[in-house]
Design a protein with these regions (language model features):
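Conserved ABC ATPase "signature" region
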Residues: 128-153
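ABC ATPase NBD Q-loop/coupling interface
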Residues: 74-93, 133
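Catalytic Walker B motif of ABC-type/P-loop ATPase nucleotide-binding domains
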Residues: 182-184
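ABC-family P-loop ATPase nucleotide-binding domain
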Residues: 1-25
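Conserved ABC nucleotide-binding domain
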Residues: 84-85, 144-162
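Helix-to-loop junction immediately C-terminal to a conserved catalytic motif
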Residues: 65
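The feature captures the beta-strand-to-loop junction immediately N-terminal to the Walker
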Residues: 50-52
Length: 184
């Protein structure tokens, strides 16, 4: 499945589920970080996963995004995309976005440039040197800056933002990619 980009309409949610996790177990040196986890998230549903340190929240997100492979169990995006058979790149391009605990932004670039870099565009050398943003792309970035509350910081370098603003910028970097499933 290298180079896969799943079109939104190919994600089959006819039975409601956008994320299907069943019987997932993950062990690290004999310690079961996840033990027979079952989780079903419906399309459009907001779900909060809470628990103490070591409860398996990060491990679960690592399994969903392909960073960690389960010892057993099934993980599907929609009904027809087996995430256990996809790599991290394929999963992110399939429409799953993930926000990490520590913000990862380009410190020496402006807020606008960070959002521009996050857009789904061709990133080869020629395109990077010669392309300019379309009106739709600029509007998308400006709308997302408004959503994340950083419109007034548009031209400010990300390294000068507060920690909380960097968190919002990273969320904005996910939003401009228009993910079908967002893990925060």
């Amino acid at each position: 499945m290298t180079g896969v980009h799943i079109k939104d309409d190919s994600i089959d949610t006819t039975h409601g589920c956008i994320l299907y996790i069943e019987g997932v177990t993950v062990s690290f040196d004999g310690f079961k970080a996840l033990n027979d986890l079952n989780l079903y998230i419906d399309d459009g549903e907001l779900r909060c996963i809470i628990g103490p340190n070591g409860a398996g929240k990060t491990t679960m997100m690592d399994v969903i995004t392909g960073k960690t492979r389960p010892d057993k169990g099934a993980v599907f995006f929609g009904q027809n995309h087996d995430l256990t058979k996809m790599n991290e790149y394929e999963i992110s391009h399939a429409g799953i976005g993930r926000k990490f605990q520590k913000p990862t932004v380009f410190q020496n670039h402006t807020v606008f440039e960070n959002l521009e870099l996050a857009l789904h565009t061709r990133k080869d050398v020629w395109q990077t040197l010669t392309r300019s943003l379309t009106r739709v792309q600029i509007d998308t970035i400006e709308k997302d800056m408004e959503t994340i509350g950083l419109k007034d910081q548009k031209n400010l370098r990300a390294g000068l933002l507060s920690h909380g603003q960097k968190q919002w910028l990273e969320i904005g970097m996910l939003l401009v990619q228009d993910p079908r499933l967002l893990l925060i």
